[in-house]
Amino acid sequence: MTNLDNNWFPNQVFEDISVWQRFSQGRSHDNYKKILLEVEKYFTSNEPTFDSISEFLKKRSDFFDLFLKVIWNKTLKSKRISLVAVGGYGRGALHPQSDLDLLILAEEIEIQSHGELIEEFLTQLWDANLIIGHSVRSIEQCISFAKADITINTNLLEHRLIAGNKKIYNDFCSELAKNLHGDTSEFFHKKLEEQENRYKRHGNTCLLYTSDAADEV
């Protein structure tokens, strides 16, 4: 999962290293915004020397993995719930200003039992001014919704476990392979149909249609 190199993190990122230490040890809830501001300041400065754009994007993704994991462990660590990165974030390459696409995965009874804790986790992310796209679903709901909506299906093509229950995530991977992503030809035809429908909505002309780069990648 997270692979942050101590050669640059956190010693080179934070002017006051104690800010990160208090956060990572669960001793502070009031400096989330400060941490994110300092990290973004670092990434947009001339200080970091990454070998490639790919490394830059991976380091950003790695940092947010760690940030989310710290907050998750404060609220939902011992629960039978998984925090999964999906979509572009699931690829492990996070562009500046990109949403963090998150799937909170659990059995329905766990979602109902721990709804307040899940809400607390999400509230902390919003309070930190994180831009997130999230869903809270069971494995069965993921499969059902993805079969009915090719956009959701596409979003589940790339995914990673960030924190939480490994068994739930492994079961999720097995069900995706068995029920959703096993037939590549069917998926291709659905994507083609989606593209054609989107084209029609824009008057059947390229002069009125600007493709969504995120959809086309």
Write out the residue ranges for each language-model feature.
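Generic recognition of stable, solvent-exposed alpha-helical segments in well-folded globular domains
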Residues: 59-66, 116, 120, 151, ...
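Active-site nucleotide-donor binding segment shared across nucleotidyl transfer reactions
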Residues: 55, 65-115
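C-terminal or mid-to-C-terminal helical accessory/interaction module adjacent to the motor/catalytic core
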Residues: 154-208
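N-terminal regions immediately upstream of nucleotidyltransferase
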Residues: 1-79, 97
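Conserved small/polar residues in nucleotide/adenosyl-binding loops
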Residues: 209-214
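Conserved catalytic core of two-metal-ion nucleotidyltransferases
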Residues: 69, 115-163
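Glycine- and acidic
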Residues: 46-56, 102-107, 204-208
